[in-house]
Amino acid sequence: LGVKRFCPTAQVTCVEKSPEAFAYLEKNARCALAGQGRQTENLLEPTAFEQADAPAFDWGPALNALKAKPAYAVQPVQGDLFTYWETLPEGQLDLIVSNPPYLTAAEMQQLQPEVAQEPAMALEAGEDGLVFYRALAQHYRQALRPGGALVLEIGWQQRQAVTDLLAENGWADIECRKDYGGNDRCIIARRPQIKL
């Protein structure tokens, strides 16, 4: 949803596996036409049109459209990262952003109490913490246009392993960005440009 905030004209699809989290994604993705009405929790409800401070404006058509079918700033999709790539046409996307689970099995055993309350499926990524990165590296490059970018959040010790996975799978211009604490936190990789 942050991508849509920074790029309001972009067509954005958000994919979520968990049915519980998907319900929240749908709620957060709903919006009114062109941001009209009052916004609450990133969600514009039909009542926002009825209470808007624009008495001279006829909210009727927009309100009726919203009540009939919610308008979405992004398209929410319930899907699984391990199979969703099969639904994507080749070379149509400009950007893929993913914050996949990245904790190893050993790290899962040492979680702080507040983190341990999170669902395991949101945290655990196999024995080495790389299972989701393997899928992204192997299957998602073809969905991007040449020069399109893949942006991944990583664990602070995963820079080299994720960089190697991406390089082995034909990604180009791989770089790492640090978080405000100075830890490796994000990797950006691109589908190679077509050479003429």
Annotate each language-model stretch with its function.
Residues 74, 116-118, 182:
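Short, solvent-exposed coil/turn segments
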